């Protein structure tokens, strides 16, 4: 247990109550009252990484003919496309003398180590040692199963080293490779916290109002198997923003996690004169237990009102709007405490059920329990929060406010 800034944090197990500032009594409860105080419990973030498909980014960013380093799952990987057109992911350190393959060169179908030119194929086997008579039979390194789909590169992570089953395949995104939609407008950032923080947002309706300036009118969750879905409708906030441009009336969103780290959000923005149909990707992969790479991208459906150039401009504008939202989240994550025992009200949603669903990806397949994967459905009654928030919005308008409360 540690004490930080007036907050006791139980790291693991149980502990006696200790205070470095025992001499201070302002705002502090007595020892006899300590049993009535709610303490934050927080175990160390798991060092095991989630089983499932993880998106490393857009394929186009790996397609320049060079090897690329990716720090993921507590290690360093190298990504390269061989001369045969296959994209490969290997452990980045050569099994010969530890050279970094990401600093090497693609030669034919192999990646050549910059140290002694050992050539490694996409199957993990050393294909050639140019200066040697023979290639050692034990010259084999770790490989990662890959998937190229809808312009994105995925890798499969499994601590048990099993191959992915068809049931967990990432679904194809209608429009991602269609001329009727724009190309991906994509963002990447590093977040220095455990990736469970972003998962909690699936059930957190209230933060959309307080952090993102939305006004939710409908909110529902369904968890089943390896999927967790958030259904949300929101109204516009007339107390926010300027008067230039078309006024946004609200949004309709169906956002599903397909496994532990890849969310597809069918998101429609409703404006006064038209609707903009988009697909938003929200995905991440862990660097280590306490940091992850957050990526998000958007495509926009073209229409008579949104021809090619204007549609791409809209994708960029909406993408920048989404970027602002994620930056608001990151600012919270950067400063908040990890908490395993959140104190909740009904309107906070099924946080514990969501975390139980999420736990399935951190245990062996044989240890997955029915309550991790059985269908769970919860619809929030938005009557009370909507009334409270609408009252705030009206007060902001009356006061001439123009910022998020």
Question: What role is predicted for each listed range?
Answer:
Residues 7, 19-22:
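Basic polycationic patches enriched in arginine
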Residues 45-46, 69, 145-147, 284-286, ...:
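A general structural signal for short secondary-structure junctions and capping/turn motifs
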Residues 86, 161-405:
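C-terminal catalytic domain of Rieske-type non-heme iron oxygenases
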Residues 50-53, 65, 150, 184-186, ...:
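Sequence-level motif detector for i,i+2 pairs with an aromatic at +2
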Residues 12, 16, 24-26, 32, ...:
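Rieske [2Fe-2S] iron-sulfur-binding domain
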Residues 50, 140, 147-149, 278, ...:
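A short, structural micro-pattern
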Residues 42-50, 213:
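Non-catalytic accessory segments flanking enzyme active sites
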């Amino acid at each position: 247990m540690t004490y930080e800034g007036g907050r006791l944090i139980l790291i693991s197990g149980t502990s006696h109550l200790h205070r470095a500032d025992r001499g201070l009594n302002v705002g502090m409860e007595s020892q006899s009252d300590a049993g009535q105080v709610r303490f934050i419990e927080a175990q160390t973030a798991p060092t095991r990484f989630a089983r499932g498909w993880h998106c490393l980014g857009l394929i186009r960013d790996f397609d320049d003919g060079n090897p690329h380093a990716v720090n993921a799952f507590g290690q360093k990987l190298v990504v390269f496309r061989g001369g045969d057109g296959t994209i490969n992911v290997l452990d980045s350190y050569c099994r010969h003398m530890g050279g970094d393959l990401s600093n090497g060169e693609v030669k034919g179908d192999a990646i050549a180590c910059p140290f002694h030119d050992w050539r490694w194929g996409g199957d993990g086997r050393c294909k050639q040692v140019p200066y040697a008579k023979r290639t050692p039979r034990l010259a084999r390194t770790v490989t990662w199963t890959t998937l190229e789909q809808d312009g994105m590169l995925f890798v499969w992570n499994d601590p048990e080293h099993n191959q992915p089953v068809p049931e967990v395949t990432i679904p194809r995104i209608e429009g991602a490779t269609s001329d009727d939609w724009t190309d991906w407008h994509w963002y990447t950032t590093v977040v220095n916290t455990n990736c469970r923080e972003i998962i909690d947002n699936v059930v957190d309706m209230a933060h959309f109002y307080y952090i993102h300036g939305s006004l939710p009118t409908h909110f529902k969750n369904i968890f089943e198997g390896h999927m967790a879905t958030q259904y949300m409708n929101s109204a516009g906030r007339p107390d926010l923003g300027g008067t230039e441009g078309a006024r946004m009336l609200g949004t309709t969103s169906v956002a599903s996690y397909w496994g532990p780290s890849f969310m597809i959000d069918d998101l429609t923005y409703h404006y006064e004169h038209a609707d903009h149909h988009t697909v938003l990707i929200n995905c991440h992969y862990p660097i280590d237990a306490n940091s992850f790479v957050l990526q998000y991208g958007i495509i926009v459906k073209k229409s008579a009102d949104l021809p090619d150039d204007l549609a791409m401009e809209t994708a960029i504008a909406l993408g920048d709007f989404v970027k602002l939202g994620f930056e608001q989240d990151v600012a919270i994550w950067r400063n908040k405490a990890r908490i395993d025992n959140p104190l909740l009200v009904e309107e906070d949603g099924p946080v514990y059920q969501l975390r139980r669903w999420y736990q399935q990806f951190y245990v062996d397949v044989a240890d997955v329990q029915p309550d991790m994967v059985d269908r769970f459905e919860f619809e929030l009654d938005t009557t009370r929060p909507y009334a409270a928030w609408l009252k705030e919005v009206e007060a902001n308008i009356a006061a001439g406010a123009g910022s998020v409360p």
